[in-house]
């Protein structure tokens, strides 16, 4: 350990495969060439935005597994999260895989958190393979946190826009790298109310 928040891994896990899937708007931006799959239909052929988000996670995981030349059955653990109640996008994405699942709830932090926890699990010798995943969908986030699109409210040009995308990383306990050598966990600084 380096100080209180940073962990140095004794056996740094190797990134064996990674993939990302995004929606149309993200594909129109300056990072277009960095994406593995850009879908022109934000429903991803599904009947709801929540199902679309789950479909993105499935696609990202399968692409990452393909790059790692592994099957889902080789995974010892999946660490995944999204912004929906009870992590339903993640839960339904990995349903039927037969892999132990840690559901994480958070926004952008979920990707770093899932990578950190998966790395700790592998470095600790509790498995050989793990996946770290995160997703969000603009439309499902609007419904849950802001103004549901069905409401028809007007958005200002400077309003937040949650990404429609999913990312997955397959980690191996041993491999040719790149490696996750360290992880730093943030502090929450709260001041106790003095009475």
Can you say where each PLM-predicted feature lies in the sequence?
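Condensing-enzyme catalytic core mediating Claisen C-C bond formation in acyl metabolism
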Residues: 1-48, 148-191
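Short alpha-helical segments and helix-capping/turn motifs at coil-helix boundaries
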Residues: 1-2, 62-67, 115-119, 154
């Amino acid at each position: 350990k380096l100080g209180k928040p940073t962990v140095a891994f004794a056996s740094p896990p190797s990134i064996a495969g990674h993939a990302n899937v995004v929606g149309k708007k993200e594909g129109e931006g300056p990072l277009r060439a960095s994406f593995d799959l850009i879908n022109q239909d934000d429903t991803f052929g599904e009947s709801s935005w929540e199902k679309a988000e789950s479909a993105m996670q499935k696609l990202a995981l399968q692409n990452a597994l393909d790059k790692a030349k592994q099957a889902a059955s080789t995974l010892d653990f999946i660490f995944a999260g999204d912004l929906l109640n009870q992590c339903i996008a993640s839960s339904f994405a990995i349903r039927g895989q037969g892999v132990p699942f840690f559901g994480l709830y958070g926004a952008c932090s979920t990707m770093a958190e899932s990578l950190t926890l998966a790395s700790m699990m592998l470095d600790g010798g509790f498995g050989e393979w793990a996946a770290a995943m995160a997703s969000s969908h603009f439309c499902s986030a609007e419904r849950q946190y802001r103004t549901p699109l069905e409401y028809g409210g007007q958005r200002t040009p400077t309003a937040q826009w949650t990404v429609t995308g999913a990312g997955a990383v397959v980690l191996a306990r041993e491999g040719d790298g790149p490696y996750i050598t360290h992880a730093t966990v943030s502090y929450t600084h709260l001041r106790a109310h003095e009475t």
